[in-house]
Amino acid sequence: MASSPERNDARRGHKPRQQGHFSRRPEPVADDWLWGWHAVEAALANPRRGEPELILATPERIKQIQAKFGVLATVQQADNQQIAQRLPQGAVHQGVAMRGAVLEDADLGDFVGGPGAVILMLDQVTDPQNVGAILRSAAAFGATGVVLQDRHAPRFTGALAKAAAGALDKIAVARVVNLSRALDELTDAGWRAIGLTGDSEQVLGDVLDGRPTVLVLGSEGEGMRRLVAEHCDELAKIPLPGGFESLNVSAAAAVALYEASRPRN
């Protein structure tokens, strides 16, 4: 059931008013926009998001926003061309874009481990499309969260959010300074760390045992760094019977998450 406009306005601190119309004056493209219906819808529903500065939407999208979230004072009506002016060239915005809703990072302590729980840790995976796809898989398979390094990881831009198809706001993401120390903290809290590498003799399916698990994936070119691998409890590989040497990191994450989601005795 949709929330009433008045209740949503009270919750968000807005006074209901008529939707404004976006000015036709072009402004510089900014990199703090989210676009696409799934990304914007998930962001508006996420309590870890700050208040948006501006939402540009076509009349049809405004109706959808009002039906689900009530009347928001930050919404302005715009046509597709006006929305596209604010976004990177080629952005597929589907008639809606949102600016300025900052996403709060999760803390490692927020990740509660139970039987079968899985965290993904990404070691220097820098491509926004890959990270977005990994977040989407993590949300689809019910992962507890994702851990990134605060450097050598992409910012949460609109391109990443679009690739994640709303998953950026449906799964907790923690950014840490040092992955090795983060692994120590998680293992002290009862998590078991398994690093994925094609050099291992062990197969992932044989190493997983149903305990709370951190799956660590490295970049496609370099893989996991040595120090990160040394802080894992086990190293394992994804078997590739077709003879191909490796998978794209987002594909590897999806396969690993599927394997981890299978019931185990």
What are these regions (language model features)?
Residues 1-113:
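N-terminal positively charged helical leader segments and presequences
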Residues 129-133, 224, 249:
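Short glycine/serine/threonine-rich phosphate/pyrophosphate-binding segments
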Residues 41, 46, 139-140, 162-167, ...:
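Structured adenosyl-cofactor binding patch, chiefly the S-adenosyl-L-methionine
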Residues 194-248:
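Active-site/ligand-binding-proximal alpha/beta "capping" segment
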Residues 113-202:
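RNA substrate-binding interface of SAM-dependent RNA methyltransferases
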Residues 59-60, 80-83, 151-153, 178, ...:
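Short, ordered loop/turn segments at secondary-structure junctions
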